[in-house]
């Protein structure tokens, strides 16, 4: 079996182009983990977000580790009306959480 590998998590805020087009998508990129099972949870200001979430199935990378992405679709109003959004990834019992704050990149 492969050695266990904890995921590296990157959270991308909506781009300014996207906001100008009246859309806002947050992307949580989870990569280089093994075994290939992760749970992704989203939070807005610490409250769970269930609507507009889409998580891909983990796929095997060329290095035999796994990668997955989770997308959170918002309106620009929703994005701006919260202080922070977090993507929380649970893998093999350990949790990684990344947060973005709308105020920093408006």
Swiss-Prot record:
A molecular-function term among this protein's GO annotations: antigen binding
The keyword Cell membrane is assigned to this record: yes
Stretches assigned to the Ig-like domain: 7-101
Keywords in alphabetical order: Adaptive immunity, Cell membrane, Disulfide bond, Immunity, Immunoglobulin, Immunoglobulin domain, Membrane, Secreted
BP term (GO), one: B cell receptor signaling pathway
Localization terms from the record: Secreted; Cell membrane
One GO term describing the cellular component: IgG immunoglobulin complex
S-S bridge residues: 28-87
CDD domains the UniProt entry points to: IgC1_L
Main location as per UniProt: secreted
Keyword Secreted: yes
Subunit structure: Immunoglobulins are composed of two identical heavy chains and two identical light chains; disulfide-linked.
Function, as annotated: Constant region of immunoglobulin light chains. Immunoglobulins, also known as antibodies, are membrane-bound or secreted glycoproteins produced by B lymphocytes. In the recognition phase of humoral immunity, the membrane-bound immunoglobulins serve as receptors which, upon binding of a specific antigen, trigger the clonal expansion and differentiation of B lymphocytes into immunoglobulins-secreting plasma cells. Secreted immunoglobulins mediate the effector phase of humoral immunity, which results in the elimination of bound antigens.
Note: Ke+ has Gly-46 and Oz- has Arg-83.
Name of the protein: Immunoglobulin lambda constant 7
Organism the protein comes from: Homo sapiens
């Amino acid at each position: 079996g492969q050695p266990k590998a904890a995921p590296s998590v990157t959270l991308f805020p909506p781009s300014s182009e996207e906001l100008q087009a009246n859309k806002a998508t947050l992307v949580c990129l989870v990569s280089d983990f093994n075994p290939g099972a992760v749970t992704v949870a989203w939070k807005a200001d610490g409250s769970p977000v269930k609507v507009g979430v889409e998580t891909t199935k983990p796929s095997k990378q060329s290095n035999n580790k796994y990668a997955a992405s989770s997308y959170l679709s918002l309106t620009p109003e929703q994005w701006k009306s919260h202080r922070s959004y977090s993507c929380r990834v649970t893998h093999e019992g350990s949790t990684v959480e990344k947060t973005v704050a709308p105020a920093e990149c408006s």
